[in-house]
Amino acid sequence: MGLGARGAWAALLLGTLQVLALLGAAHESAAMAASANIENSGLPHNSSANSTETLQHVPSDHTNETSNSTVKPPTSVASDSSNTTVTTMKPTAASNTTTPGMVSTNMTSTTLKSTPKTTSVSQNTSQISTSTMTVTHNSSVTSAASSVTITTTMHSEAKKGSKFDTGSFVGGIVLTLGVLSILYIGCKMYYSRRGIRYRTIDEHDAII
């Protein structure tokens, strides 16, 4: 490869690097302007009277990963309790910035290349980077068991006297006679067959 080709490749590489640098600077300026607007809109609502400011510098290449793949927003977070924490971050490169409200702003990004400046404001001389407030509601459930008494009144007709049922009496007699007649006929048929068998055996013996 000649010197001319190498020079062309070097010039192309330098031009690419310059273009990337210009794009990065433009993106950085846009992100800084957006963060400045967010600070101007958020900080007046979340200031306190007697506050101490503590500056904390974070390294430039910083990646924030949460369970929902979200990065802590460059806004000010304030709570109503005595401990007030305000966190301000100035990123240089960000993407997909969503500002749902004045108090909390979620900025989704994969990698942040920034030089954030964290300001912690505390009233009770306690510096907190992330404040978590847990509210526990203790509810007691009282179940009242009500007893319901149902009184059922059954009016039964008083039996004046036992009446003689002629139909059931006659039916019982007919049923008894029917069973006896069936037994009689069965026994008679059994004995008649038995007598025929004995008689045939006697005749056979007599013939022999």
Swiss-Prot record:
Which coarse location class applies to the principal site listed for this UniProt protein? membrane
Q: Where is the composition biased (Polar residues)?
A: 42-57, 65-107
GO cellular component assignments: cytoplasmic vesicle; external side of plasma membrane; membrane
| Tissue specificity annotation | Ubiquitous. Not expressed in ovary. Expressed in keratinocytes.
Database matches in InterPro entries: CD164_MGC24 (IPR007947)
Q: What does this protein do?
A: Implicated in oncotic cell death, characterized by cell swelling, organelle swelling, vacuolization and increased membrane permeability.
UniProt-recorded name of the protein: Porimin
Organism in which the protein naturally occurs: Homo sapiens (Human)
